[in-house]
């Protein structure tokens, strides 16, 4: 018999009417240890909350696609910085949960079945080179795509995550001729950081705001029908990656900003950590890892 906490597990998450009972039944029908049961429940809740926020709709098991599971995997790895083993554990759980739903006839297919686990590899993040960035921004300018220019600029100049861009509201922006900033908010605790916006970024955001559709929404990035979710922002980024022949995703732009910042401000990990919103400076230190060529060039400069 399902326990009270299992039935109420999804409280606070926008879900369909059947979902709480389905999750409780899944947990109840498997012989999990109590501690494992709670961890699995929290993993499902984490996915449900992400789904609702990313797609701006209630979490309903029949609405989940393989694309959602792939995006969630990327969210855990790139946005939340979870270890490969932690991400893979979540994928195994989702595959089991949706597999059970499929076997019970609640969904037509298991959306997690074909999603591959991540391979263990060094975490040194890569960034775009300057020529690639110029090519992307040139294509945006040629198409006079002011919304794309603003979104890409926030990632390239302010190190914004895709969730930062989606969650940014009009009152979070301070823009004037001499300076400007954006306040990004994260998660249930409304953790926030205020990041200065360089002149090119301020100009890009201001130009977009002047043509932004006048809909009743506080969100900065909107379409004619309402605020853009993570899918909408990701589509913008991937569109210009395709145009430029680059495997482009939102977090690659954030990595690029971090690399350029350290090139111009060598060793200033504290400032970069504040901009990126890293609570652990060891995460920021990954951007200091050098390639063999860079190490060789640095060694050649030694002179006694």
Label the model's feature ranges:
Residues 1-304:
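Conserved catalytic core of the tyrosine transesterase superfamily
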């Amino acid at each position: 018999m399902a326990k009270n906490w299992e039935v109420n597990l999804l409280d606070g998450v926008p879900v369909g009417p059947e979902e709480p009972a389905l999750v409780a039944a899944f947990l109840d029908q498997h012989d999990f240890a109590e501690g494992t049961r709670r961890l699995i429940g929290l993993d499902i809740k984490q996915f449900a909350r992400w789904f609702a926020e990313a797609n701006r709709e209630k979490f309903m098991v029949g609405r989940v696609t393989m694309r959602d599971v792939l995006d969630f995997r990327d969210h855990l790895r790139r946005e939340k910085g979870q270890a490969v083993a932690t991400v893979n554990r979540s994928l195994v759980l989702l595959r089991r949960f949706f597999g059970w739903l499929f076997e019970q006839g609640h969904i037509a297919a298991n959306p997690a079945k074909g999603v591959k686990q991540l391979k263990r590899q060094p975490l040194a993040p890569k960034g775009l080179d300057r020529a690639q960035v110029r090519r992307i921004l040139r294509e945006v300018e040629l198409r006079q795509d002011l919304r794309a220019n603003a979104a890409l600029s926030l990632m390239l100049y302010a190190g914004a995550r895709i969730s930062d861009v989606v969650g940014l509201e009009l009152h979070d922006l301070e823009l004037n001729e001499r300076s400007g900033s954006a306040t990004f908010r994260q998660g249930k605790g409304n953790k926030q950081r205020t990041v200065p916006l360089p002149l090119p970024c301020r100009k890009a955001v201001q130009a977009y705001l002047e043509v932004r559709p006048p809909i009743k929404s506080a969100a900065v990035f909107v379409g004619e029908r309402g605020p853009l979710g993570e899918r909408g922002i990701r589509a913008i980024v991937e569109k210009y990656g395709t145009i430029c022949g680059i495997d482009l995703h939102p977090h690659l732009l954030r990595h690029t900003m971090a690399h350029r910042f350290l090139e111009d401000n060598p060793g200033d990990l504290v400032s970069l950590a504040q901009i990126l919103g890293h609570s652990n400076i060891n995460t920021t230190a990954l951007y200091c890892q050098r390639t063999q060529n860079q190490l060789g060039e640095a060694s050649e400069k030694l002179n006694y």
